């Protein structure tokens, strides 16, 4: 049987503390401690992380750390970094942290020199992208490649597309990237629009080279290329990120242009592996190395810092605090940077696929709520969409605000005297302030507001936020941000006793889709389905496609 964390004395002490502090108000917490904004903050690498606007006291944090220790967080953290098989349902090591180890590090797992393997692939990626960026690699007609189209899904898409947008200012070799993931043909058609086959390179990202959506899109892309340039062009315009040399070769890709990765890398943790090939093609191997160094900086902090001063630990524990003791089900991620527009979508997979589990690692039911629903949009777009609910709604939604002191782009304000970036960041600081402290009925009445309107204008405040401030959005900072959330996921998963590194919940739907495809397409009318809803939907679909229902 797995450990029931809720039965421990540490958890029960935390539950009593929750009852004692009740709805402790942030106004009062700041009034009681003039230095709270400085004391409840930590600087790690390029990230200044302010967690003072949370409903926590020093005692809360101490009790949360006690729970983490009761769950064996430090031991399990060390087990992950050393390559033990902590993914128990698949009997695998979990070594995404090895992807960013420096060349002189040492790590042997299951008899294999992991660091040497990682850097062999990174070197091959670097050599290939150097040729691509310099124009040494030419397409079938002798023209330079100007567009890389990454075809993948899930972790083979969400990471690269997010990082590509985040680091668009570091594109410096005349190469741009597009990303195709959805098996809806509209995705591929839109991404191929306006492209010249002679200057386009496809990266097919599939570990097994058998992922249905990816191979369907890859085959359609191959057909598009062959129609323009002929069969022999495939080897000059397709490369693979895969471990299945046989299927890669059968597709027409030279296996010398196949870049591998390992079973100990989960898809949602793989953007810093060969899955990042499209990113490296755009920003270059040196910037990609900076990206990896950012991950490693946070890895080392997480591995070595005391739990009480460990940023991923503290943020993971605070997330658990709201999830399990306040009934909060979601967390908003609100980057005040349009270049991080895809960050919330990336975190959705990272967090929800990892911790969306209802059984513990040993198969027994969990004893408390697990997983956070991540969502969000860049500021200030979100302010004009859903912040109303954050400020005055009945649901508690903790939020992470991410901002930068230096802009990647800046323009003057309407009157020509100010900076649009300053305007953006004034909203960042104002929103966290208003969410925390609100505005009372007395304060609103004192402004001469009509009594009938006062209740509608009251801002209750006491809405929790984390503020993450960095100097600038650089490759290193992007790596730091990703690793910060990766390790939060681990912290919460350990305390809940779940396996954060499998994803069995996505498998049954894939199997069922394969079974249903011929039901949709066969010439003969289908047999009755196992439920009346699916049966009616299938028959309506067939009828509207002109097939016998």
Curated annotation (Swiss-Prot):
- Entry-linked CDD domains: SIS_PGI_1 (cd05015), SIS_PGI_2 (cd05016)
Q: Does the keyword Isomerase apply?
A: yes
Q: What is its EC number?
A: 5.3.1.9
Q: Which reaction does it catalyse?
A: alpha-D-glucose 6-phosphate = beta-D-fructose 6-phosphate
Q: InterPro entries in the record, alphabetically?
A: G6P_Isomerase (IPR001672), G6P_Isomerase_C (IPR023096), Phosphoglucose_isomerase_CS (IPR018189), SIS_dom_sf (IPR046348), SIS_PGI_1 (IPR035476), SIS_PGI_2 (IPR035482)
Instruction: Write out the entry's keywords from A to Z.
Output: Cytoplasm, Gluconeogenesis, Glycolysis, Isomerase
This protein's pathway reads:
Carbohydrate biosynthesis; gluconeogenesis; Carbohydrate degradation; glycolysis; D-glyceraldehyde 3-phosphate and glycerone phosphate from D-glucose: step 2/4
Return the broad EC class.
isomerase
Keyword Cytoplasm listed? The answer is yes
Q: Name one GO molecular function term.
A: monosaccharide binding
Return the HAMAP family for the record: G6P_isomerase
Q: What is this protein identified as?
A: Glucose-6-phosphate isomerase
**Protein's organism:** Mycolicibacterium gilvum (strain PYR-GCK) (Mycobacterium gilvum (strain PYR-GCK))
Q: What is the lineage of its organism?
A: Bacteria, Bacillati, Actinomycetota, Actinomycetes, Mycobacteriales
